[in-house]
Amino acid sequence: MGNDAIDDVTTAPRNASSRGAETVRVSSTDITISIGRVLVEEGFSGNPREHRQGTNRFPVSTSKYQGRTRKARITTRRRVSKPGLRIYPGYKDIPEVSGGIGTATPPTPGGTTTDREARQKRIGGEAPRHVWR
C-alpha cells in the first residue's frame, strides 16, 4: 500500500486477483470503506468484512473472478481527480464509464455513490476514480 488510499482500494483487489489471491486488505479510512462498499454493490469485489489485528482494523474483501480462466473483475482503473488537479463535475457532466460497463465513484454530500445514482439524484461531486471490466 502506498500513500494514496483511494488508489489502493482499487489497485489492491486488481493485483490480488491477478496473482490468484482470495482476499485483500486495504487501509481503513472513511473514503476507502465507502468506495469498497460501492465496489461490492457493483460486483467488482465480494464478501466485505473487518479484520482486527491488535488495536488496528482493516477492511478485507474477497476477490471476484469471471469465467473459467478466473480473469479479474477489475481489469482497468483510472484516477481522474488527482491531489494536484481536482475535478468536480456537475451531475450532467459525470461521464458514463465505458458505455455503462464500468462505474465512477464520486463522493457526494450524501456519501460515496455510483455514477448512475449521482446522475439520478442530480448530485455532483469529485470524480476520483473510474473502474471497469
From Swiss-Prot:
Write out the ranges of the annotated region (Disordered): 1-23, 44-133
Key words of the record: Chloroplast, Plastid, Ribonucleoprotein, Ribosomal protein, RNA-binding, rRNA-binding
- Composition bias (Basic and acidic residues) maps to 114-133
Answer yes or no on keyword Ribosomal protein: yes
List the SUPFAM superfamilies. Answer: Ribosomal protein S8
* Compositional bias segments (type: Basic residues): 67-81
Please give one Pfam family short name.
Ribosomal_S8
Q: Which GO terms describe its cellular component?
A: chloroplast; ribonucleoprotein complex; ribosome
Q: Which family does it belong to?
A: Belongs to the universal ribosomal protein uS8 family.
The subunit field of the Swiss-Prot or TrEMBL record says: Part of the 30S ribosomal subunit.
Listed name of the protein: Small ribosomal subunit protein uS8c
Please report the organism this UniProt entry assigns to the protein: Selaginella uncinata
